[in-house]
Amino acid sequence: IHRRKVACQACHAQAVKQCYGCHVGTDAKGIAYFKCQKTTLGFKIGRNPSPTPDRPYTYDVKRHPPVIPGTFDFYSPAAIKQFGQSPTWKACAPHTIQRHTTQNSACNNCHGNRDLFLDISDLADDEVAANAAVVVADDQLPSTLAHDALPPN
């Protein structure tokens, strides 16, 4: 339906695990560990900041890598010196592809659905500048459609 405007995964992927705030360190006994501040199940549709002939889409699926400033300080203080210089929400191709999904069962499951699209409110304060190119502003959301039927398969 959307051809080169929307990546196939936006309509055909199911939710994937999103991790936030990964920390690496050692416990009191010196045993290495990592932990995340939180995890959620879902995904967001965001803008494609760098279209290519192979990925010409305006919109694609984004996932949140768990890295934050300080993640690797256990190994080397300030190991991520350039955090915030590129988007932290990355394009992904989840292994949850299905022909029929919640979002492709009706047009308005995506059109006009703010929750499905990456919003500035989804970002941590230190991610806002880096993700400006992938956030979908309100005026970029696909409008709710008067008809809500998909063409027959």
Predicted regions and their residues:
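C-type cytochrome heme-c attachment and multiheme electron-transfer modules
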Residues: 1-153
